[in-house]
From Swiss-Prot:
Disulfide bonds: none annotated. One of its GO terms (biological process) is RNA modification. The keyword Manganese does not apply. Belongs to the PPR family. PCMP-E subfamily. Residues 463-493 are annotated as: Type E(+) motif. InterPro entries: E_motif, Pentatricopeptide_rpt, PPR_At4g14850-like_plant, TPR-like_helical_dom_sf. This is Pentatricopeptide repeat-containing protein At2g36730. One of its GO terms (molecular function) is RNA binding. The keyword Repeat applies. It comes from the Eukaryota. Residues 384-462 are annotated as: Type E motif. Pfam families: E_motif, PPR, PPR_2. The gene is PCMP-E44.
Length: 501
């Protein structure tokens, strides 16, 4: 880095500020810092503020350096401390934002309205509910409880920490709201499984004359929960409002259609998208694999590798392994599994090991699947064992070495109170005509008051999902169930048409 001694420069301070604006690496930042000391500018508040900004928020990010600067300075400007707090809030150590605020209080630096949004964002990042509640007390103390940005971040915090009632309370008490406020509360509802309330909230938003944006639609699409009719309705809103089909919105549409079984629509959106990222490709590949279009999924993966600059991630490989499972491609499954780490530097996760067990289990290679589990680099979870036990039930004639028995014992050791495990074991005994053993398992379940999770049936009618569970008390639900079935029968009758050849 070349420093000019030309007298045309108004001052060394001006020169330092120019280089700080151009700084793009820690190496350059340290050089500039050295020149600042040589120029005796190390106590200049504006220079310190710029140094903190660059080391907290730019490409030359070094939060430890920014922290040291502030600790050795007498800067009492809240905006400078806010920059360090903001840097920590989006770092791997968001809890350090709390230290920044504590240091501000110790020095008697009064916070401003930008102080608390960064602190609340940090609390959401490390799921610091207690810390977040303490920050909310500080918000009230300093009179920022009516600030819209503070409110939005409080909603985000409580939603992330699964406190939807608190999130809704903050939202309801806001005197000023913007689109982000509505998006925040709807996101909180989606993340906590309250999908029906999301669309009620959206209707309320429209009723209050707020204009939904791209984020609103992405949130609504994630709330469709496999409801194709509802997904189409949201898509129509995207088109009516003439929102740009960018990568983020397009990916949300592809993901929704793929999860809802509307693969033709997913393909149409996918093909029309100009910009696709790894999540777009992965959503399409996973959707195809899960709905039986395994060969097409593998072809699409091959196309992604050859014709685009996009590199696969862990979700992409999950879709690829799922496709191999559905087509019985055991050798290809092994190949892709090993390529993950060797070529693409993606360390296989539990879910990938489970997918390989599924591939081997479906192919009837029970011993191989069992050995594969025993060689895993970490302790397999119950899902992996259940996958193998399911395969043992299907291929019980080929289980010469009693793999099913070993898996059964291990599964009960891992989850002794999970009723589903004992149900699987009882069914396995029944399939093998071991009636006494099956009865014994059922007896244990009954004595320990262990109940099987009720089976659930879903019916989509008029854009709404209606759920029915086995074991309903007919005295309470009988009438409404049969009224709905009569309505369904009527709709089928109305839609029925004879086709003449």
């Amino acid at each position: 880095m070349i420093w000019s001694s030309d007298s045309c420069f108004k001052s060394r301070k001006h020169q330092c500020l120019i280089f700080l604006k151009l700084c793009s690496s820690i190496k350059h930042l340290l050089q500039i810092h050295g020149q600042i000391h040589l120029s005796s500018l190390q106590n200049d508040s504006f220079i310190i503020s710029e140094l903190v900004r660059v080391s907290s928020l730019s490409l030359a990010k070094d939060l430890a350096f920014a922290r040291t600067l502030l600790l050795h300075s007498s800067d009492s400007t809240p905006s400078t401390w806010n920059m360090l707090s903001r840097g920590y809030s989006s770092s791997d150590s968001p809890v350090e934002s709390i230290w920044v605020y504590s240091e501000m209080k110790r020095r008697g630096i009064k916070p401003n309205k930008l102080t608390f949004p960064f602190l609340l964002k940090a609390c959401a990042s490390f799921l610091g509910l207690t810390a977040g509640r303490q920050i909310q007390v500080e918000v009230l103390k300093h009179g920022f409880d009516f600030d819209v940005y503070v409110g939005n971040n409080l909603i985000h915090l409580y939603g992330t920490c699964k406190k939807t009632s608190d999130a809704r309370k903050v939202f309801d008490e806001m005197t000023e709201r913007n689109v982000v406020s509505w998006n925040s509360i709807m996101t909180a509802l989606v993340e906590n499984g309250k999908l029906n309330l999301v669309f009620e909230c959206f209707c309320e938003m429209i009723g209050k004359r707020f204009c939904p944006d791209e984020t609103t639609m992405v949130v609504l699409l994630s709330a469709c929960g496999g409801n194709l009719s509802l997904g189409k309705l949201v898509h129509s809103q995207v088109m009516v409002r003439e929102l740009e089909l960018n990568c983020r919105l397009g990916t949300a549409l592809v993901d929704m259609y793929a999860k809802s079984g509307g693969l033709e629509y997913a393909r149409l959106v996918f093909e029309r998208m100009v910009d696709k990222n790894v999540w777009t490709w992965s959503a399409m590949i996973v959707g195809l694999a899960q709905y039986g279009f395994a060969e097409e999924a593998l072809q699409l993966f091959s196309k992604m590798m050859k014709e685009s600059s996009v590199r696969p991630n862990y979700v992409t490989f999950l879709g690829v392994l799922c496709a191999c499972s559905h087509t019985g491609l055991v050798d290809d499954g092994y190949k892709y599994f090993h390529e993950m780490e060797k070529i693409h530097k993606i360390k296989p996760m539990m879910i990938h090991y489970g997918a390989m067990v599924d591939i081997l289990g479906r192919a009837g290679r029970l011993n191989e699947a069992y050995d594969f589990i025993k060689k895993m680099p970490f302790e397999p979870d119950a899902v992996v064992w259940r996958t193998l036990l399911s395969a043992c039930s299907i291929h019980h004639d080929e289980d010469d070495e009693g793999i099913g028995e070993k898996v059964k014992k291990r599964l009960i050791e891992l989850e002794p109170k999970r009723s589903g495990n004992l149900v699987i074991v009882a069914n396995r005994f029944a399939e093998a005509r071991m009636w006494a053993e099956a009865a014994e398992v059922r007896r244990v379940m009954k004595e320990t008051k262990m109940k099987k999770i009720a089976g659930e049936s879903c019916l989509e009618l008029g854009g709404s999902f209606h759920r029915f569970f086995s074991g309903y008390d007919p005295r309470s639900e009988y009438v409404s169930i049969y009224e709905l079935l009569d309505l369904f029968k009527f709709q089928l009758t109305c839609d029925y048409r004879l086709v003449s050849e």
